[in-house]
């Protein structure tokens, strides 16, 4: 279910999207071809199997176009439903002109969100039987982060930080600026002792230094499988409360191998930065 903040973000996104479509005038094609007052029944229907996310977002689009009482919902599925090609996810009755005006914004958002949910399910299924969780990143499309991260949750994934201020994540450029990974961690802890702190390492030497400091999480950047196994062994012996996350070089084909090493998370930027949409159409 969308949180209040996600609802607000969805409304903002929808208003911008509708403005993009209508800033130069009304839908001239629809105005010319569809008689005023025509009422139709329309269904959003996937053209391929997938996991649905964004049904409430589609309804928010209709709210913007019609008002909350300007259309009737005849059928809907809940987010997370796994549908086959041809199975409707949403059926509404509404004025044809308004529905055609809303069509592209509804489809753009629901196709994108359902694509994210579908690929996230594939990753979650790939690591099933291990303790590893699939986690997203900040590699999101500008303006769509809240909806993309919601879709990851629909698919069974876990959200990483929403912005730069809710968790500290020390990366290579921070280390370069301050001099060492230990100095970077200590600087962050001094500045924001109340925040959880995560540290990216790219070698076993950096890992050893961080295990001595015990941050909340250590991100293993582009570690091959053997190095990841060593990292888990050292963590288990020296700092068992520290979480480990694998990042870089991950694929659906090797996800189970990395998850089987004992890491806690797999960081998957591809969930959001380059996901393929789920093909969905609106049928009247």
From Swiss-Prot:
Protein name: Nicotinate-nucleotide pyrophosphorylase [carboxylating]
GO CC, any one term: cytoplasm
Single GO molecular function: nicotinate-nucleotide diphosphorylase (carboxylating) activity
Gene Ontology BP terms: NAD biosynthetic process; quinolinate catabolic process
InterPro entries: Aldolase_TIM (IPR013785), NadC (IPR004393), NadC/ModD (IPR027277), Nicotinate_pribotase-like_C (IPR036068), Quinolinate_PRibosylTase_N_sf (IPR037128), Quinolinate_PRibosylTrfase_C (IPR002638), Quinolinate_PRibosylTrfase_N (IPR022412)
Subunit architecture: Hexamer formed by 3 homodimers.
Function field: Involved in the catabolism of quinolinic acid (QA).
Enzyme category, top tier: transferase
Reaction catalysis annotation: nicotinate beta-D-ribonucleotide + CO2 + diphosphate = quinolinate + 5-phospho-alpha-D-ribose 1-diphosphate + 2 H(+)
Known pathway: Cofactor biosynthesis; NAD(+) biosynthesis; nicotinate D-ribonucleotide from quinolinate: step 1/1
EC number(s) per entry: 2.4.2.19
Similarity comment text for this entry: Belongs to the NadC/ModD family.
Keyword field: Glycosyltransferase, Pyridine nucleotide biosynthesis, Transferase
Top-level taxonomy: Bacteria, Bacillati, Actinomycetota, Actinomycetes, Mycobacteriales
Positions of substrate binding: 104, 137-139, 161, 171, 200, 221, 247-249, 268-270
């Amino acid at each position: 279910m969308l949180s209040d903040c996600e609802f607000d973000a969805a409304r903002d996104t929808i208003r911008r999207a509708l403005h993009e479509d209508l800033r130069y005038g009304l839908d001239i094609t629809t105005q010319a071809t569809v008689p005023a007052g025509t009422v139709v029944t329309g269904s959003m229907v996937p053209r391929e199997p997938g996991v649905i996310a964004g049904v409430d977002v589609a309804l928010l689009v209709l709210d913007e176009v019609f008002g909350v009482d300007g259309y009737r919902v005849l059928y809907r599925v809940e987010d997370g439903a796994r549908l086959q090609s041809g199975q409707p996810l949403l059926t509404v009755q509404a004025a044809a002109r308004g529905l055609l005006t809303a069509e592209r914004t509804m489809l753009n958002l629901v196709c994108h969100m359902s694509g994210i949910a579908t690929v996230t399910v594939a990753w979650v299924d790939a690591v099933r039987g291990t303790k590893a969780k699939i986690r997203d990143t900040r590699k999101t499309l500008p303006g769509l982060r809240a909806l993309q991260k919601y879709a990851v949750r629909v698919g069974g994934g876990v959200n990483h930080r929403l912005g730069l201020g809710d968790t500290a994540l020390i990366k290579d450029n921070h280390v370069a600026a301050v001099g060492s990974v230990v100095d970077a961690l200590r600087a962050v802890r001094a500045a924001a002792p109340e925040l959880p702190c995560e540290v990216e390492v790219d070698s076993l030497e950096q890992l050893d230094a961080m295990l001595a400091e015990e941050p909340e999480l250590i991100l293993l950047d582009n570690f091959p499988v053997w190095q990841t196994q060593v990292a888990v062994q050292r963590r288990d012996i020296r700092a068992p409360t520290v979480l480990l996350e694998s990042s870089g070089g991950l694929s659906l084909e090797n996800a189970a191998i990395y998850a089987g090493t004992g890491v806690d998370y797999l960081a998957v930027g591809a969930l959001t930065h380059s996901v393929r949409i789920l093909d969905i159409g609106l049928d009247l």
